[in-house]
Amino acid sequence: IFAATGGAESGATTSTANITFDDVLELFYSLRSPYRKKAVWVLNDSTVKALRKLKDSTGNYIWNPSVQAGVPDTILNRPYYTSSYVPEIKAGAKCLAFGDFSYYWIGDRQGRSFKRLNEVFAMNGQVGFLASQRVDGRLILTEAVKTLGMKA
């Protein structure tokens, strides 16, 4: 999704280092309405921090945390998830994704295989194991997820 090719469709900010509330709104409404029904935000913790600092023209914070126990915070009334694999805010990086991730499919290409390695660790009285599995993921419908890229 955050790759340069084969990922989600991307929009760009007007800044190389900051996200504005207008950028977030543009990303939200760039996603077609059928996908917004199940859409979620995916971003890095540092991006959450930057979004929480955004203020409107009167100086009020735009972020409204949940006031009910057990109800998560939202961005524009849509839930968000943080991931350390999402790039941080920097020039040229895609730092925010919004969309219906049910169109991101994960495929197991072969079953798991386990191999017992008796000889390798025999001198230490140990037994080793080697496990492998081939897995891949792909965004099947690119219009279902949009990303926000920082200006290069």
Where do the PLM segments sit?
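Structured, hydrophobic secondary-structure cores that serve as assembly/anchoring elements
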Residues: 1-152
